[in-house]
Amino acid sequence: MSDEFNANQFLKTVTSSPGVYRMYDAKDAVIYVGKAKDLKKRLSSYFRKNLANVKTQALVSHIANIDVTVTHSETDALILENDYIKQYMPKYNVLLRDDKSYPYILLSNHQHPRLAYHRGPKRDKGQYFGPYPNGGAVRESLHLMQKIFPIRQCDDLYYKSRSRPCLQYQIGRCSAPCVDLVSEEDYQEQVRLATLFLKGKNQQVMSVLVQKMEQASSDMRYEQAALYRDQITALRRVSEQQEVSNASGDMDVIGAYYASGVACFHLLFIREGKIFGSRSYYPKVPVNTEVSEVLRSFMLQFYLNSDSQRLTPKEILISDAFEEQAELADAIQSAQNKKVEIKTQVRGERASFLRLALTNATNAVNTRLSHKNTIEQRFLLLEEAIESTNKIQRMECFDISHTMGESTVASCVVFNREGPSKADYRRYNITGITPGDDYAAMKQAITRRFDKITEKGKIPDILFIDGGIGQLRIAQKVVDEQFVALDNAPTLIGVAKGEGRKPGLETLIYGESEESFSLPADSGALHLIQHIRDESHRFAITGHRNKRQKTRNTSTLETIAGVGPKRRKALLQYLGGLQEVKGASVSELAKVPGISLEMAQTIHDALRG
């Protein structure tokens, strides 16, 4: 506790009402946010002589000031506490790192509705189904539905531009409403069945399809009956793969496990009795935090995140009880205007779901701990191999990627003692150099990385360069220039490919002395170097391919006078890609919003050249 903070004097001013408190350190940064039913009683507990909790002792030792906000009720205090935690991200709070909104399937409100992936604010009119645990689950579901229901998934601009059916129609995954190859009645019937399917009512869909197949067969419409038969077969195959409970309804099932400083909350999303998917969360947990506080903090931030598109079900099952369960349920009801039950003691199928979630959480933590131990061991071996007197906390690796000098991209990936730190990854688009000049590309990337670097900046202990002595010399020269006024420059090591480019035969080169050395193929230190090198290569080539594709899609259009970014985007979206634009007639080009007949002729002539 700061010498300037007088706890006794402060506590005399605190009320016994419910509210929220913010603790500040000497730098005026919020280090902890908490809530209390009785502020005076709760805050007094921090300043007792014998504090058993090590984490609380550390927290109190840094307190320089405390702000208190009184609320009308404990429920209001819970909601405000969550808002403050999100705002300040305090050091001593358990922090849920989940800033992504959840994806949904959108069934649009169009004359011929489309099924689409959606993430973010629900601005488009239509029905939203979800949330799904991740984007992959949505795409998998959409791919699955294409095989069962011939409903379009193209965007509206593409739909409007069609004068003939696309490939999806040819392979039986769309009924081509864009060119009137399906009746309005039949299309809407498929939309209705898809809606029931997304609501989990598979048996109802099956009954309708069987009835329609039998009716079509009776009417001797055998081709139509065969189509219904194929739908039934596909639907039955899907239903067999899904674990369905007719009694469970909508639930979130949370398995919580915490060991050796690593916490995992594994969520099963149960919607309409069906497992929609699952997702694991790894909150940032301060050392020596009690399990009950970890669980409470996770639930608070997860369900009171006002920015999320998440829909909370009426029932939440958790593997462990925690304090203030009832208060949290009240806070959710207040925030979302929906009654929620939080349960731990359940039987039958619910208990089975809970065991499954807990098993997944336990396995996830054990896997992370194993990975963490492996990474830590490899760091120790690397320190030994290069005879480092200091502990390596941060490593970076640079790589260059291009195709014959086109669309050059440099990557910088970062590893710490827990493995890849993807939030710190960076890509650099390289410009103004001779195409294919890897030395100039490396110089530009390293210069941009360390431009205006300071003592307090994120400086790596080791900087790996994926390349030979030439690129290493360039990088070393830039680092020497940038760190001339600093005494904490990184150690540079080049990673040159071995004979036949075989893994395990790499030659390692120190940047300063240019002394080369190698490590045994089975060395854990070498495996760590290979890991960061391969990750740097992957990150560079992914960025290069994306840039190259974007360039090739637009470069042809960029040379046409009068076709700026907006018109290029409209042409590509409306017609469905560069090849479609090249193959379009003048009249088809003129249908694109913002393209006059005269401009269409100009574009047509330029592309046909």
From Swiss-Prot:
Residues 203-238 form the UVR domain. Residues 16-94 form the GIY-YIG domain. HAMAP family: UvrC. GO terms for biological process: nucleotide-excision repair; SOS response. It comes from Shewanella pealeana (strain ATCC 700345 / ANG-SQ1). Transmembrane segments: none annotated. This is UvrABC system protein C. SMART domains: GIYc, HhH1. The keyword DNA repair applies. The keyword DNA damage applies. Keywords: Cytoplasm, DNA damage, DNA excision, DNA repair, Excision nuclease, SOS response. Belongs to the UvrC family. GO terms for cellular component: cytoplasm; excinuclease repair complex. The gene is uvrC. It is found in: Cytoplasm. Its main location: cytoplasm. Interacts with UvrB in an incision complex. The UvrABC repair system catalyzes the recognition and processing of DNA lesions. UvrC both incises the 5' and 3' sides of the lesion. The N-terminal half is responsible for the 3' incision and the C-terminal half is responsible for the 5' incision. PANTHER family: UVRABC SYSTEM PROTEIN C, UVRC/OXIDOREDUCTASE. CDD domains: GIY-YIG_UvrC_Cho. GO terms for molecular function: DNA binding; excinuclease ABC activity. InterPro entries: GIY-YIG_endonuc, GIY-YIG_endonuc_sf, GIY-YIG_UvrC_Cho, Hlx-hairpin-Hlx_DNA-bd_motif, RuvA_2-like, UVR_dom, UVR_dom_sf, UvrABC_protein_C.
